[in-house]
């Protein structure tokens, strides 16, 4: 089941996503987040996390770094700084060096 869902996301990334300008406000992109969540949490919880993330990605949020957390949650990762490297941090956070 997990491989089928990842395959569907890959089809989206290859065939549909290139037709539109980039609009994801987060890093990693929502489709990459979905794949990471499916790999880390399995098909059911990963799908729920991926859909939740996609719903959070809208013009009313600031966005930024939001990697898949180690524990299941439908909310934004509360500690993204644990995963940021210096380049990503400087890209998304103006107060970083």
Swiss-Prot record:
It is a peripheral membrane protein. It holds the Pfam family YidD. GO terms for cellular component: plasma membrane. This is Putative membrane protein insertion efficiency factor. It is found in: Cell membrane. It comes from the Bacteria. Could be involved in insertion of integral membrane proteins into the membrane. SMART domains: Haemolytic. Keywords: Cell membrane, Membrane. The keyword Protein biosynthesis does not apply. Transmembrane segments: none annotated. InterPro entries: Membr_insert_effic_factor_YidD (IPR002696). Belongs to the UPF0161 family. The lineage of its organism: Bacteria, Bacillati, Bacillota, Bacilli, Lactobacillales. It comes from Lactobacillus helveticus (strain DPC 4571). The keyword Coiled coil does not apply.
């Amino acid at each position: 089941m997990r491989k089928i869902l990842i395959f569907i996301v890959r089809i989206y990334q290859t065939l549909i996503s290139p037709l539109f300008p980039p609009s994801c406000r987060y890093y990693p992109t929502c489709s990459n987040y979905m794949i990471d969540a499916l790999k880390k949490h399995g098909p059911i919880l990963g799908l729920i996390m991926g859909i939740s993330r996609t719903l959070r990605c809208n013009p009313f949020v600031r966005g930024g770094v939001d990697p898949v957390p180690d524990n299941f949650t439908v909310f934004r990762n509360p500690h993204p700084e644990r995963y940021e490297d210096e380049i990503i941090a400087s890209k998304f956070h103006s107060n970083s060096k």
